[in-house]
Amino acid sequence: MSWKNDLLAKLAQRDKSMETQKDVFLSFQFLSTRIASLERQLDTVQRDDSKKTVLDLLGEIDQLKQKLDLAEDSLKHETAKNKELVKELSTVKNNLNILTDGYKKLQERHLRLQEESKIKFQNLESLNDDILSLNIENNLLNDRMAKLKQENESLIERWMKRVKQEAEVLNDANEALSRSEKSLKPEG
């Protein structure tokens, strides 16, 4: 789940940036207050016409203005960085939403496929049972057909023997009749 880690890291970075900006704001506020105080002192000094104090205060004001400029630059930089982090966070949130939707769709598809697979497996089991029952029925019919074939061959064999015997009897009777007719006919 690296996207979660990325999101948490971006949020921590944003919080750190905000904390850094807090220090910049506080520095800016302190420097503004200090400059105002020094300017008041300068006004007081100008009234006192003390050149040395004025020069010292002007030098301090210049230093404070430089610090203030640095603080403003830092604030601008941190603000830009914060905007960038907010954009990245928005992108990460959008990506997270897209991934979440995709995950939900995949999960639904997975459940549908599992249900289809379950139904197909049940149908396959039913089909296998039907095939097994048809195989048993086929084997029984093959056994019965083999027995009937054997009985048929046996009947044909007995019938052929009987027909052969009857033919022999008829042949013998014809031969006897033919001999008796020859013997009854006068010669000559």
UniProtKB/Swiss-Prot annotation:
Residues 27-185 form a coiled coil. One of its GO terms (cellular component) is phagophore assembly site membrane. Homodimer. Part of the ATG5-ATG12/ATG16 complex. Several units of each may be present in this complex. InterPro entries: Autophagy-rel_prot_16_dom (IPR013923). Pfam families: ATG16. This is Autophagy-related protein 16. The lineage of its organism: Eukaryota, Fungi, Dikarya, Ascomycota, Saccharomycotina. Belongs to the ATG16 family. Gene3D superfamilies: 1.20.5.170. Stabilizes the ATG5-ATG12 conjugate which is necessary for autophagy. The ATG5-ATG12/ATG16 complex is required for efficient promotion of ATG8-conjugation to phosphatidylethanolamine and ATG8 localization to the pre-autophagosomal structure (PAS). Also recruits ATG3 to the PAS. Involved in endoplasmic reticulum-specific autophagic process and is essential for the survival of cells subjected to severe ER stress. It is found in: Preautophagosomal structure membrane. It comes from Pichia angusta. It is a peripheral membrane protein. One of its GO terms (biological process) is protein transport. Keywords: Autophagy, Coiled coil, Membrane, Protein transport, Transport.
